[in-house]
Amino acid sequence: MYGRSNAPGCQPPVRAHPPSSPMTSRLQLAAMEQNASDAALSGMQQARSRQASPKRLRDLIPSSDVESMSLNALDDAYGHHDFSVWFEDLMPPEMELLMPTTDAKLNYLSFTRRLASSVFHSPDNRMPGGACDHTSALDARKERFATIINKFLDLHQILHDA
């Protein structure tokens, strides 16, 4: 079906039949499936080996070195390695039910930080009488704390002058 080339080292092209072709034998199908499963297994084994032994700073640097050495000395001693970034999950277990993925947790933290910032910097919370109940309660506590501290400072000044 294909013409031969006279050039040295050239081989005629091989016509491959798709797996669904009636020309493909069962042995060829089995060999292709085996090759695909071998490739998938080797990829999974490589991923497991990377996950099984990540290099983390806490595993490599002893705590005595962290406490006793300066940052430059630590960099000189351990800075030539590549390390995995490791995030500690500090969310309460109850929140794990509501937000099982890391993306959901990060979105929640981002949203609550933006919400707190917008509440804090909103003009209504800066005007007396326009604040919400929570802001009013916090402002009352701040004022009470300030008056108590001022009384202690006044007492200290009186005792110091006497």
Swiss-Prot record:
Keyword annotations from UniProtKB, A to Z: Host nucleus, Viral genome packaging, Viral release from host cell
Disordered: annotated segments: 1-58
Subcellular location: Host nucleus
Secreted is among the record's keywords: no
Biased composition (Polar residues): 43-52
GO cellular component, one term: host cell nucleus
Biological processes per GO annotation: viral DNA genome packaging
HAMAP family: HSV_TRM2
Family the UniProt entry places it in: Belongs to the herpesviridae TRM2 protein family.
Assembly and oligomerization: Associates with TRM1 and TRM3 to form the tripartite terminase complex.
Function: Component of the molecular motor that translocates viral genomic DNA in empty capsid during DNA packaging. Forms a tripartite terminase complex together with TRM1 and TRM3 in the host cytoplasm. Once the complex reaches the host nucleus, it interacts with the capsid portal vertex. This portal forms a ring in which genomic DNA is translocated into the capsid.
Protein name (Swiss-Prot/TrEMBL): Tripartite terminase subunit 2
UniProt source species: Equine herpesvirus 1 (strain Ab4p) (EHV-1)
